[in-house]
Curated annotation (Swiss-Prot):
Upper taxonomic lineage: Eukaryota, Viridiplantae, Streptophyta, Embryophyta, Tracheophyta
Tissues expressing this chain: Preferentially expressed in the shoot apex than in the leaves and stems. Expressed in the shoot apex and root tips in 5-day-old seedlings. At the shoot apex it is expressed in young leaves and in broad areas between two cotyledons. Weakly or not expressed in vascular tissues except vascular tissue near the shoot apical meristem. In the root, it extends from the root apical meristem to the elongation zone.
Region (Disordered): 492-533
Protein name: Protein TONSOKU
Family of this protein: Belongs to the Tonsoku family.
Length: 1311
């Protein structure tokens, strides 16, 4: 809908005006308005629609007013002027009824339904609007069905789209009325109609159905299904150039990521949505809402960080509670744990982490029971019910709400009874028991009235109003209730105003509750909870406060509007419904951390220890500062802890309000003994800022100044004669993540922190220590032993790090200088990457969370540094970085020498390649270019062809997953000539690509003398293309062909394999995964073993292999002529018998080293004896292949933490759902048979001596079975002493020392 269309329509309008043709004049005015409307220019569109309307009213008959009324109603709706929209839409309907025009009546009813629906979404309590929307949508559906079955004469469309859109609108309405199951049914029916009627794949009607199904499955917590439908919606809108719909799709996807705590992904989606929204002229409301939602996500990230801190606090307090058993401090410790759990419950609800919420609520229930406090226990029952309610397990939520009511009734707590009754009503409403729900709400109202609790009365009345209006359709009763609700609100506001006037001078009364938050989710999004829970930490921290009465203030419930934050897509996209995400309250920073890290430099001549430059015997106290903690910081998630110090603990215990920040004790520091903190550098470990350092008030033995979350301060620097650094680790979380794989990451982290804290004069030398080994208790630690030491120790741990020399890291020094000059915080991830770099000219900063701004210091440093390889992959870099790279290479004195640029998985657009075209020095230097997984689109076609044509040194090009089509592939083919040095080309996963463009490309590649590797995975190849492929694969130089998921079939695969291996002197790599291969393919390979004599790596995963094919494959592996070194058979439906056959065949095989047999035996069908492996996790021990089981936590907690995003995952109810130990998940095989299979597998595995990597993931093996298999793996003579394993949940990797079983992304693997 470009400017040319508008100009042409305006010319036609002026021409009609000149000749006086009023009908044509009105038609063209409407046409101009429609073009402008679709372009997002609503104000200008309104002007032209008004011209159309004025002409039609003055000069044309009544029937000609129908289209102009419809257009005006539509544009006013998009401008959110509902009053004007309704005027013209009702006039449209009136005219249609007068003319007895069924088509126009259907359109008018649809528009009226949409307008009333939008009014409902924008209003606070407009139940009449939703009823009107329901009436008009149902009428539109009936009319659409009539038109579909009996279309009017002369109408050829059949009104299929209108009928499908009617299903969409009804489904959207059901969703907004909290009927997601009904919505799913009708929306699925709409998709079914699309399929039956063969509606185009990329059709707007499908887009709207997928959009709303995404919302439905989000409401049902079916995250995978929701994502699938949302991505389909986005894809369709992108294909049909529906910018507004694509933006709304990205908003939906962002909401999904936010609800599953994937905040980085959510921000990325909002960024895309914002770019799309800003491209439309009059969508400022949409842009503002996206910006608002982005802020909410950032607040959620902060809350999640706080939650993780408080988890550490809980761990510490739980340990203290255990230690205090049987002492006078026991109850006090229990109250502190209870208060901490309350805070965790609040924060988990803020970020929709309902599985965690359930975990904490059950622990709160348990500890409330131990406290013998019936009120706290009844409140805890209510919180457990809230968890189940939000996890959509309504039967269980009802059970706990009823128990809460019974508990509060037993102690005569009226507020608790009222809230429990309201929550019971919510649960009954969710399962369709509307009469029971109404009775529960009315009972809750009577109790609240009796207890004189106006806020709870209001909440109950609103729920009663909801039931009468929306469930029973009793408009008269609903109207009476609305008046009662309004009167109650007015009286409550008056009372609050009076109270605030009386209390405005009461400083002491308000101080204790100054920071009590009333931002707990209300009844519209989660069950009601007593306000006593919000102030619980006040009561819990002092036993004297145990009997504090419940606070009566409660936010009124709004169950009716709990879906309002979700925008639906209607039959024609009209406006962007603002999503009122629950604003995450800025909660007080709660600090945590059981242990902390201190690095102590020892001096041979003195035993004085320096902690932050403070002598051990000093007695000064340093002010505490607030801290922001990174959720991904490896070592410093628990930065400071109020309870680390007895004096502070006492203040917390004795104070009347733990929400009021403690005032720091101001004591003048001993300046002669403490160095200034002004030179400290805060390390931005995850792109967020860290503030200052933290020093705790000392204990009775002297002051212990401690570092904050992001800092380890070195105020004394010396290279001691024994070249050792003493490390006292006080926080087990510090090193657990780093050392869970090996101890090298621990060494690297400590080294980088050491360097950061050096004085400037030492730092300027760029010298960093090389930590040779870590020692503990006089012995050298073996790999991963630090993990066990930290886990098992209840006290501080002192580790000695032996320094084995010093290494000069020039680029690190340059980077730090540029950070200082640009006022940017250094990135810890980037520093670690630079430190471990072995080749100075090879710069690998992949996965450092770099953005254009944070990458600037590195690019600045590279101006005075030579580059042979630059890896910026897996970051968030955009075209701005590419422009700086062009300037970097253009200004560099390095005019010659090979250059590798790895830029995959970023945010580069098509013009990023333009920067390469504008840099002549790259024409001579660039040898490897990887820009895969960037949204380049066909707009980069001319740039890409220029690069291929002019970069004569280029031998490797990767443009996979770049949204390219035939046009770009054809341009690349045209740019190739016989002089090109291209050797490797990856174009996979780009669609659609036509057969002719692929054939042209293959023909050009066949003329290249040195072409060796081609990847076309994910591109569907026709039989004609396969024929063209034979000529290329016969070329002697070709050594790697990847055509997975290409659909070439068995015959094509046989011909390709024959051609590829034809007279090949060198080995080749072949990927035929997911190609629909039949058993005849494997039989052919077995019959002509020369076909596989040249294959080094062979991927046939994803092809279902029958018993006949398995036998042939087994025979092939036994043949000594087979040279296959790597074989992938994942997802081949081998089953246990097939696994056994393949492994048994390896006893005589001398070549196969890597075998992937994952996803072949379904867990539900063939779980081998004992518990499934996912119920326990096993930690890898690298000492002689032994394995140490990690102590399992409580079953509830373990299941809760397994996956916060699993659909329908719930924690076992400890009281009525005991988990059975040692039961198998299936009985499809008898136990003796299962034991026999494992025994045979073990025997075969011990004889497969050549094998070095074996992947058995997702095959349903139990812990006992895997233990048996691993014993056989490690007992093999070729693997004795070097056997390793990685077993966690369903991941099962057996390997040998020196091999990497996993960890490298598929897109980053280099041959």
């Amino acid at each position: 809908m470009g400017r040319l269309d508008v100009a042409a329509a305006k010319r036609a309008y002026r021409k009609a005006e000149e000749v006086g043709d009023r009908r044509e004049q009105a038609r063209w005015a409407n046409n101009v308005g429609d073009i402008l409307k679709n372009h997002g220019e609503y104000v200008d569109a309104l002007k032209w629609f008004r011209i159309d309307y004025d002409i039609s009213v003055k000069y044309l008959p009544g029937k000609d007013l129908l289209p102009t009324c419809q257009s005006l109603g539509e544009i006013y709706l998009r401008l959110e002027n509902f009053e004007e929209a309704l005027i013209y839409q009702k006039k449209h309907l009136q005219l249609a009824e007068e003319a007895n025009d069924t088509v126009e009546k259907q359109r008018a009813c649809t528009q009226l339904g949409r307008t009333y629906h939008e009014m409902f979404l924008k209003s606070e309590d407009d139940c009449e609007a939703i009823q009107s929307a329901k009436k008009y949508f149902k009428k539109a559906m009936e009319l659409a069905q009539i038109l579909k079955e009996k279309p009017p004469p002369g109408e050829s469309s059949g009104f299929l789209e209108e009928y499908i859109n009617a299903h969409n609108n009804i489904g959207m309405l059901d969703l907004d009325l909290d009927n997601p199951e009904a919505a799913r049914t009708i929306l699925k029916k709409g998709l079914q109609i699309c399929d039956e009627e063969e509606v185009r794949e990329y059709d707007a009607a499908r887009s709207r159905l997928h959009h709303n199904l995404g919302n439905v499955f989000m409401a049902l917590r079916s995250w995978d299904e929701a994502k699938k439908h949302i991505e389909m919606d986005i894809n369709i809108c992108h294909k049909i150039n529906h910018v507004q719909g694509e933006a709304k799709g990205y908003i939906n996807l962002a909401e999904l990521h936010n609800k599953t705590q994937k905040y980085i992904d959510a921000l990325l989606c909002y960024g895309k949505a914002s770019s799309l929204a800003k491209s439309m002229q009059d969508e400022s409301a949409l842009v503002e809402q996206i910006e608002h939602n982005t802020k909410i996500v950032k607040k959620s990230m902060k809350v999640m960080e706080e939650l993780r801190e408080e988890e550490l606090m809980l761990k510490k307090l739980s340990a203290e509670m255990t230690d205090a058993k049987g002492t006078s401090e026991e109850r006090k410790s229990m109250l502190q744990v209870n208060a901490c759990l309350g805070s965790l419950i609040d924060k988990s609800s803020m970020v929709f982490a309902w599985l965690k919420h359930l975990q904490y609520s059950k622990r709160k229930k348990k500890i409330s029971d131990e406290l013998c406090d019936k009120e706290k226990l009844s409140d805890a029952f209510m919180i457990v019910g809230e968890s189940y309610q939000n996890l959509r397990n309504f039967r269980k939520s009802l059970k706990w709400f009823i128990r809460s009511y019974e508990g509060h009734e037993a102690i005569g707590n009226l507020e608790g009874q009222a809230l429990a009754k309201i929550n019971i009503g919510n649960g009954l409403d969710c399962i369709g028991e509307w009469t029971g729900a109404l009775q529960a709400y009315e009972e809750g109202y009577r109790i609240a009235l009796k207890a004189n609790l106006p806020s709870i009365q209001l909440s109950a009345l609103e729920d009663i109003h909801y039931i009468h209006m929306m469930r029973f359709g009793n408009a008269q009763k609903a109207s009476e209730l609305k008046e009662t609700i309004q009167n109650l609100k007015e009286s409550e506001h008056a009372e609050k105003a009076e109270c605030s006037t009386q209390d405005e001078c009461s400083e002491t009364d308000s101080e204790g509750h100054a920071n009590v938050s009333n931002d707990r989710p209300n009844a519209c999004s989660s069950p009601q909870t007593p306000n006593s829970l919000r102030s619980e930490r006040l009561a819990d921290l002092d036993e004297a406060n145990d009997d504090v009465p419940l606070i009566s203030f409660l936010q009124p419930g709004k169950r009716l509007f709990k879906r309002k934050q979700v925008s639906g897509k209607q039959d024609a996209d009209t406006d962007q419904t603002k999503k009122d995400f629950s604003v995450v309250a800025d909660s007080q920073q709660t600090v945590a951390g059981r242990k902390r890290i201190r690095v102590i430099l020892s001096d041979d001549e003195s035993e004085t220890e320096y902690e932050l430059g403070c002598p051990k015997d000093s007695s000064h106290k340093v002010l505490r500062q607030n801290e922001e903690v990174s959720e991904e910081s490896m070592y410093f998630d628990g930065a400071i802890n109020y309870t680390d110090n007895r004096a502070i603990q006492d203040n917390v215990e004795e104070g009347s309000c733990s929400y009021t920040p403690l005032h720091p004790i101001k004591v003048a520091p001993n300046v002669s003994n403490c160095r200034s903190l002004s030179n400290n550098i805060a390390v931005e470990t995850t792109g967020r800022r860290k503030k200052g350092s933290q020093c705790d008030v000392g204990d009775s033995n002297g002051t212990s100044c401690k570092t904050g979350a992001a800092l380890v301060n070195f105020h004394a620097y010396s290279k001691t004669e024994d070249r050792k650094i003493k490390i006292e680790i006080e926080n087990e979380h510090i090193a657990l993540d780093s050392c869970s794989h090996d101890d090298e990451s621990v060494k690297v982290e400590l080294t980088c922190l050491y360097y950061l804290q050096l004085p400037d004069d030492e730092k300027s030398k760029g010298l960093l220590p090389i930590i040779h080994h870590l020692e503990y208790g006089g012995r050298v630690l073996k790999p991963l032993e630090l993990y066990a030491i930290l886990r098992d120790s209840s006290e501080n741990v002192v580790i000695e790090a032996s320094v084995d020399g010093w290494v000069h890291k020039r680029l690190m020094k340059l980077y730090m200088d540029c950070c200082q000059s640009l006022s940017e915080k250094p990135s810890m991830k980037l520093l670690k990457k630079l430190y471990i770099s072995e080749v100075e000219d090879d710069i690998n900063v992949s996965e450092c969370e770099l953005q254009d701004i944070s990458a600037a210091p590195l690019l600045c440093a590279l101006h005075v540094h030579n580059i042979a390889m630059l890896d910026l992959s897996h970051n968030m870099l955009g075209n701005g970085t590419m422009e700086k790279l062009k300037q970097l290479f253009a200004s560099s004195s390095q005019m010659y020498g090979a250059l590798t640029l790895d830029l995959h998985c970023n945010r580069f657009g098509p013009t990023a390649l333009f920067q390469i075209c504008e840099c002549p020095v790259l024409f001579t230097r660039l040898e490897v270019l990887n820009v895969s997984r960037n949204r380049l689109t066909d707009a980069c076609g001319s740039y890409l062809s220029t690069i291929v044509k002019n970069c004569r040194a280029l031998y490797s090009l990767n443009v996979e997953h770049c949204s390219l089509t035939s046009r770009t592939i054809q341009k690349v083919a045209n740019a190739l000539d016989s002089k090109s040095g291209l050797s490797q080309l990856c174009i996979g996963y780009n669609n659609p690509v036509s057969g002719s463009s692929i054939q042209n490309l293959l023909a050009k590649l066949a003329t290249l003398s040195s072409f060796a590797e081609l990847s076309m995975n994910g591109i569907k190849l026709s039989s004609q293309v396969v024929d063209s492929l034979y000529a290329l694969v016969k070329t002697p130089s070709l050594s790697k062909l990847l055509v997975g998921s290409s659909g070439i079939g068995t015959d094509g695969a046989i011909k390709v394999t024959e051609s590829l291996c034809y007279q090949k002197e060198e080995t080749v790599k072949l990927d035929l995964s997911c190609c629909g291969l039949a058993s005849s393919f494997f039989i052919k390979l077995n019959q002509d073993v020369t076909l596989t004599s040249s294959i080094l790596e062979f991927n046939v995963g994803g092809n279902p292999i029958t018993e006949e094919g398995i036998s042939a494959l087994g025979e092939l592996l036994r043949n000594p002529c087979s040279n296959i070194k790597v074989l992938i058979l994942s997802k081949c439906h081998l089953k246990l018998a097939g696994l056994l056959c393949i492994i048994q065949a390896l006893s005589d095989n001398k070549n196969l080293e890597e075998l992937n047999l994952s996803d072949n035996a379904k867990i539900e069908d063939e779980t081998v004896f004992g518990q499934p492996v996912k119920e326990r996790s096993v930690m890898v021990e690298q000492e002689h292949g032994t394995c140490k089981s990690v102590t399992s936590m409580d079953k509830e907690q373990e299941l809760c933490e397994t996956n916060m995003e699993c659909d329908d995952l719930e924690v076992a109810d400890s009281e009525d759902e005991q988990i059975e130990e040692g039961t198998a998940t299936s009985s499809s095989l008898s136990l003796p048979r299962k034991n026999h299979i494992v025994k045979e597998l073990s025997t075969a595995l011990s004889m497969a001596n050549q094998l070095k990597i074996l992947d058995l993931s997702n095959n349903g093996f139990s812990v006992e079975a895997l233990e048996t298999l691993y014993m056989s793996w490690s007992s093999s003579s070729s693997r004795t002493g070097i056997a390793q394993r990685h077993v966690k949940e369903e991941t099962v990797h057996f390997y040998v020392e020196g091999k990497m079983c996993c960890g490298v992304k598929s897109c980053c693997r280099k041959d």
